[in-house]
Amino acid sequence: MKKWLPAVALVAAFVASLYVGATQIDNFWSALFNPDSNEILWQIRFPRVTAAVIVGAALAVAGLLAQGACNNAVAEPAILGTAAGASFGAVLAISAGLVQVGTIGAIACGTIGALLTTSLTFKLAAIRGALSSFGLILVGIAVSAIFTALVGIASAMVSRADARSISFWSFGSLALITPDNLIGVAITTVIGIAIAWKICRSKSAQ
């Protein structure tokens, strides 16, 4: 029974998140089973809450991969410089006028930045002979600090409006989620989790 408690809690939190909001939804339970009956519920709240669950799963897998790569329970993407690299890649592209905040281009640039900084962390750790779990974390913290500072510099180069947008976007928001781009989020996450599963299986077999 205990193994089902997290799933039950997730479903309960999901439904509660659909119900609670600035606007009261009349006949909530009826609207919940009739997608065409309430635009606020199905066009705004449902995509955002679903995206929150999907992104949460992706973050959990990312944390698991970081812990496995470093063999350290406290490792996470933020410590390895991955998060700072993602922010820097996106912010640099936005400040250069190549992409707009919240677009696929910004996400792609962020992904490239994350890959490059994570690779840099491992390369620097290898050069220093510090490929231990503790050494990787120390190098990752240094790389993260450097790229976080670079994000601040890049943000200072854009207009005040763009700087606010970048700041808001960097902290993360579900405000731009729609039923259309929710599909892209779901597909990308499923592919990423499948790749992570394959990596974990191959490592376990060694």
Positions of predicted regions on the chain:
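Alpha-helical transmembrane segments in inner-membrane proteins
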Residues: 1-206
